[in-house]
């Protein structure tokens, strides 16, 4: 009887389940797709005909440009610190109104010497050194789109490339501002000519997760006092 009741309850709950509706996110291309221009077809030149002398460089919103990413950077720094401090204090009472010859003055002190009553010295020394070296090298080729044309004629570009191999995502994102005159005749531009460049090359997957320390190790490193 209990099994029958449980079966009825399960069927009732299954019938009340709401079907999950997947929300479609607009693609990158749809977000930047410009409105198609309208042309009047003539008897000689059609709208789809390419001009005889046409510059194929990107110039309008939505046009594609090829970016040659060549980023090389190296830096090194070295620091050395050496400090030392010495202090010495001594005191003696060779003459004290004739009392230094009195046997009662130093009677309570064993082996007391008035010429050497107090002596102290301190010595502090610290040495430290450090060095750091960093080198980066990123070579890639990707295409980007003109997202906006500024009033001064410069272009805002943005590109994204996602490559997935064996459930490992490699994501390359580029953003920046370029000048039209820096674009070569073959519609390419070097990343060194991009102002306010933001280049990100990251990865998601098992390999990327294994390269990061665990959460407990991060906590121990944060609170470890030594």
From Swiss-Prot:
Q: What is this protein called?
A: Flagellar L-ring protein
Mark the residues modified by lipid (N-palmitoyl cysteine): 16
Which species does the entry assign this protein to? Geobacter sulfurreducens (strain ATCC 51573 / DSM 12127 / PCA)
Set out the biological process GO terms recorded for this chain's protein. bacterial-type flagellum-dependent cell motility
In the record, what terms sit under GO molecular function? cytoskeletal motor activity
Question: For this UniProt entry, what is the primary localization, expressed as one broad class?
Answer: membrane
Lineage, top-rank taxon, reads Bacteria
Protein family per UniProt: Belongs to the FlgH family.
**InterPro entries, A to Z:** Flag_Lring
User: Membrane topology per the record?
Assistant: Lipid-anchor
Is Signal a UniProt keyword of this protein? yes
Which residues form the lipid moiety-binding region (S-diacylglycerol cysteine)?
16
């Amino acid at each position: 009887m209990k099994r029958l009741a449980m079966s009825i309850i399960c069927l009732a709950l299954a019938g009340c389940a709401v079907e999950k509706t997947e929300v479609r996110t607009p693609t990158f291309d749809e977000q930047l797709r410009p409105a198609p221009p309208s042309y009047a077809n003539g008897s000689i030149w059609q709208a789809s005909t390419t001009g005889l002398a046409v510059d194929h460089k990107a110039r309008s919103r939505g046009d594609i440009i090829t970016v040659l990413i060549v980023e090389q950077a190296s830096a090194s720094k070295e620091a050395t610190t050496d400090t030392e401090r010495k202090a010495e204090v001594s005191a003696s009472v060779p003459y004290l109104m004739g009392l230094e010859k009195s046997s009662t003055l130093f009677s309570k002190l064993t082996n007391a010497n008035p010429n050497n009553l107090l002596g102290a010295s301190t010595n502090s020394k610290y040495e430290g050194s450090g060095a750091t070296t960093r080198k980066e090298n990123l070579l890639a080729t990707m295409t980007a789109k003109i997202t906006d044309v500024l009033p001064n004629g410069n272009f805002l570009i943005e590109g994204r490339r996602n490559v997935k191999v064996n459930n490992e995502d490699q994501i390359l994102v580029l953003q920046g501002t370029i000048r039209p005159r820096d674009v070569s005749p073959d519609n390419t531009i070097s990343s060194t000519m991009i102002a306010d460049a933001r280049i990100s090359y990251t990865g998601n997957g098992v390999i990327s997760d294994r390269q990061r320390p665990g959460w407990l190790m991060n906590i121990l490193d944060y609170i470890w006092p030594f």
